[in-house]
Amino acid sequence: MTLESMMACCLSDEVKESKRINAEIEKQLRRDKRDARRELKLLLLGTGESGKSTFIKQMRIIHGAGYSEEDKRGFTKLVYQNIFTAMQAMIRAMETLKILYKYEQNKANALLIREVDVEKVTTFEHRYVSAIKTLWNDPGIQECYDRRREYQLSDSAKYYLTDVDRIATSGYLPTQQDVLRVRVPTTGIIEYPFDLENIIFRMVDVGGQRSERRKWIHCFENVTSIMFLVALSEYDQVLVESDNENRMEESKALFRTIVTYPWFQNSSVILFLNKKDLLEDKILHSHLVDYFPEFDGPQRDAQAAREFILKMFVDLNPDSDKIIYSHFTCATDTENIRFVFAAVKDTILQLNLKEYNLV
């Protein structure tokens, strides 16, 4: 074999090896691209207290590891703090609304509770338990609770306050429902990834209060679906940030912005009309027509009210080709969310079969 033929042979081996390496790299790049596509980004949007964080907690219960005893124990002081926050809100509202306590001793109880620094609460001492129970049973406080739309009070107030005896026991461990109902305003961005049928669903929850929305902008890339939550029960409530603006009008304005954003042109939109249980309770004594005069359906009819609210939101979509997928939900009800999210998952996968190499 001549030197030239030996060199040609070595060269062709090098070329072959180089080609093989190149092919491997190309293959890996294609694989990486495919794997990246197997991650679906779901952006959870909605105004403050619409139920986004509760929805994320449900995903952890339904599709993740759930909450261990240790995890639940971590919520104990938050439950206590929620109770104090609720009672303090009602004590302040008693003054604002000029409602009198029926029982004289409750003036002293109110003073005791009012002076508590909620953020420093880590235990639930007997004197506070006793004061809160006596206050909650006062007809004045009950009247104040019935007028809660006139001030800011957590949806979980009644749930916790009617169960103070259980929560006050020594060795109290929050239940799954206690965890779901804890209210902690979301500041910043919370991501929760979970794996379903070899596809990663990355759910992103951003704060709903106005001050938090500035932080949304960088979440807008590669969003598969927008999941927009509306609290059905907020039709007669005012904003935390502005007490002369209706919460549902704010929610509508935000939804209109979202469905018309160029960023979201290719993202599917799923509308969750949440807190259907609270609507059913509230509609019996607070009439939708008083806040939305265009409502011409029957009073005290939850079905008519929710269909009207759904239509109000769907009508904000100017693109007739874009379908708004909608579901009525109760985010604190695990079985309801399990059922609804199974349907949502199927919708998202159907819409993205080709894009995400799922076929």
Curated annotation (Swiss-Prot):
It catalyses: GTP + H2O = GDP + phosphate + H(+). Residues 38-359 form the G-alpha domain. Residues 178-186 are annotated as: G2 motif. It holds the Pfam family G-alpha. InterPro entries: Gprotein_alpha_Q, Gprotein_alpha_su, GproteinA_insert, P-loop_NTPase. Residues 329-334 are annotated as: G5 motif. Residues 270-277 are annotated as: G4 motif. G proteins are composed of 3 units; alpha, beta and gamma. The alpha chain contains the guanine nucleotide binding site. Interacts with RGS22. Interacts with NTSR1. This is Guanine nucleotide-binding protein subunit alpha-11. It comes from Bos taurus.
